Curated annotation (Swiss-Prot):
The gene is tmoB. The keyword Manganese does not apply. Its EC number is 1.14.13.236. It comes from Ectopseudomonas mendocina. This is Toluene-4-monooxygenase system, hydroxylase component subunit gamma. It catalyses: toluene + NADH + O2 + H(+) = 4-methylphenol + NAD(+) + H2O.
Length: 84
């Protein structure tokens, strides 16, 4: 495992959390790891596909892109949002 820390803001959560993911994790896996710390704790569960983007960007990362391929820097802020 190649640990890679990111700050994550989950849609409708009031916290930004430091979450450790793996460089080989897909964006779907990253979204799941972030959701684990938010959903059913401070955010109600919801149907839909979770997506990842750079903080305050409108462009979503491809779901199968890995952290290593994303160009993100350690501790950079990402948003996890539900796809409309």
């Amino acid at each position: 495992m190649s640990a890679f820390p990111v700050h994550a803001a989950f849609e409708k959560d009031f916290l930004v959390q430091l979450v450790v993911v793996d460089l080989n994790d897909s964006m779907d896996q990253v979204a799941e790891k972030v959701a684990y710390h938010c959903v059913n704790r401070r955010v109600a569960p919801r149907e839909g596909v979770m997506r990842v983007r750079k903080h305050r960007s409108t462009e979503l990362f491809p779901r199968d892109m890995t952290i290593a391929e994303s160009g993100l820097n350690p501790t950079e802020v990402i948003d996890v949002v539900f796809e409309e």
